[in-house]
A protein has these predicted regions:
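Active-site rim elements
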Residues: 3-11, 85-92
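Short, contiguous alpha-helical
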Residues: 7-15, 19-22, 30-76, 119-158
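Alpha-helix C-capping/helix-to-loop hinge sites
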Residues: 28-31, 81
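Acidic/histidine-rich alpha-helical segments that form the ligand environment
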Residues: 78-116, 127-136
């Protein structure tokens, strides 16, 4: 791993975490997709994780943030059980969109940007990124637990 600057380390860790995310998503059996944990179906847990990553990694207060085409009001809220349903293709498409968005963002990021606040935002870029890594990996762990409880197998990780 190259450790030449903070943004290089953040970029590499993000690339690895995106790989882990793809791996976990690929390991979720179709039979588990609609099973509810804590009241929410597995796909909604995934959507929640992805939506928060999409909105919070860069700037949660961005007035130009656009909800994904599959979004319905409160779909990301795990306390509100949806009438809508997302299939694997819709989740995968959203994941690929986020992956591309983060790649562009990280390409433009420099160390001196990390302690700056994005426009209209309370927190620094560094705080937002670390907070998302915490939240993101909490949900990856939950998803891995769902898979392991169902299959007895643990998804492979880096």
């Amino acid at each position: 791993m190259r450790e030449t600057s903070y943004h290089v380390v953040i970029t590499e860790m993000t690339v690895r975490a995106l790989w882990e995310t793809q791996n976990v998503l690929d390991c979720i059996p179709d039979a588990l997709w609609d099973i509810r944990f804590g009241g929410a179906p597995v796909w909604q847990h995934i959507y929640h994780m992805l939506h928060e990553l999409d909105q919070w990694f860069i700037n949660p207060d961005d007035p130009d943030f656009v909800e994904p085409p599959v979004h319905h009001p409160h779909l990301q809220n795990l306390s509100i059980y949806p009438a809508a349903h997302l299939d694997r293709r819709q989740i995968d498409d959203y994941f690929y969109t986020i992956k591309a968005k983060l790649s562009l963002y990280l390409t433009s990021l420099h160390d001196e940007d990390l302690l700056q606040r994005p426009e209209n935002c309370t927190w620094t870029r560094f705080t937002l990124i670390l907070a998302q890594f915490r939240h993101w990996h909490l949900h990856l762990g939950m998803l891995m637990g769902f898979v392991q409880a169902d299959t007895g197998l643990c998804p492979r990780t880096l």
